[in-house]
Amino acid sequence: MMETQLYIGIMSGTSMDGADAVLIRMDGGKWLGAEGHAFTPYPGRLRRKLLDLQDTGADELHRSRMLSQELSRLYAQTAAELLCSQNLAPSDITALGCHGQTVRHAPEHSYSVQLADLPLLAERTQIFTVGDFRSRDLAAGGQGAPLVPAFHEALFRDDRETRAVLNIGGIANISVLPPDAPAFGFDTGPGNMLMDAWMQAHWQLPYDKNGAKAAQGNILPQLLDRLLAHPYFAQPHPKSTGRELFALNWLETYLDGGENRYDVLRTLSRFTAQTVFDAVSHAAADARQMYICGGGIRNPVLMADLAECFGTRVSLHSTAELNLDPQWVEAAAFAWMAACWVNRIPGSPHKATGASKPCILGAGYYY
């Protein structure tokens, strides 16, 4: 009888707060469960350098390569901590899937840039490494994002009803899982990104812990309406987005400077919730259950905004109710994609990205 296999997934999202590593167990292409997690926060200096690369500037090529190496050393450290916590050796792991750190996402030009020195990561970890997952989908005419709907479908689909899965990272994205049709999904718009940027600019804090600052503010209806008028929200899916559209300087074009900082933050929370509600109402009108993952689930103000928007129409749940910690989901997805690569299984959600066909995502690097 063939033994089961262990994989590690490493993910650092658009919130740029750090790197998550998750250990999963597979039986060939069959998911058996997630078994461990490690997290390494980004030092402030690293985060600032990554944010600086979001905009064009001098010496970009050199800076991006140096940051790729720095990130890969941090990723290797995170993987080592995970192995240590599980009493495992690198030789126990079949493959490691690494997403890298997105610094540019331009599907209209058929490219998306995730920083990671994958050969260095393979060398540092002594584990076969799979990465650069988005490029293959882009080559087939897709958006390169979101990639997680195929993983959500493999784990969370129900044969009796349509489910929605909401990931709230820097960008929010939904996966729609019909019982009798392929999964699809798309980016709904900003998740935590604008709230985090506002916190950094006005409180010098990386995020609004427990929604404490937003809870002190009031929604500004006129500002909310102006934000919701962005043409991205009227575009049909498949679609994806990032900081290129929804950066702090975009928000500031709608402000006169006299707004209370707490009120703006409160409005940004409702903005995220409203765009999610509008997307689900349009694309998954028959969904009655929505399972939530990502960092946004820890913000009670945002969760209350979602509950108010959806009312009794859709029940909101954590993915923990489906046996996967909401903080582990994205990293687990890239471990699963590494397993798909090893087993030559197409892992791309082409109905979500708009690619012409299902693809085996990623490129592999031996140590």
UniProtKB/Swiss-Prot annotation:
Biological process according to GO: 1,6-anhydro-N-acetyl-beta-muramic acid catabolic process; amino sugar metabolic process; peptidoglycan turnover
Q: Tell me which domain of life the UniProt entry assigns to the organism this sequence originates from.
A: Bacteria
Give the family, as the similarity comment puts it.
Answer: Belongs to the anhydro-N-acetylmuramic acid kinase family.
| Pathway per the UniProt entry | Amino-sugar metabolism; 1,6-anhydro-N-acetylmuramate degradation; Cell wall biogenesis; peptidoglycan recycling
* Assigned keywords, A-Z: ATP-binding, Carbohydrate metabolism, Kinase, Nucleotide-binding, Transferase
Q: Upper taxonomic classification of the species?
A: Bacteria, Pseudomonadati, Pseudomonadota, Betaproteobacteria, Neisseriales
Q: Which InterPro entries match?
A: Anhydro_N_Ac-Mur_kinase, ATPase_NBD
Show the Pfam families listed in the entry. AnmK (PF03702)
Q: What is this protein called?
A: Anhydro-N-acetylmuramic acid kinase
Function per UniProt: Catalyzes the specific phosphorylation of 1,6-anhydro-N-acetylmuramic acid (anhMurNAc) with the simultaneous cleavage of the 1,6-anhydro ring, generating MurNAc-6-P. Is required for the utilization of anhMurNAc either imported from the medium or derived from its own cell wall murein, and thus plays a role in cell wall recycling.
Its Enzyme Commission number(s) read: 2.7.1.170
- Which one of the record's GO molecular function terms can you name? kinase activity
Name the CDD domains for this protein: ASKHA_NBD_ANMK
Which reaction equations make up its catalytic activity?
1,6-anhydro-N-acetyl-beta-muramate + ATP + H2O = N-acetyl-D-muramate 6-phosphate + ADP + H(+)
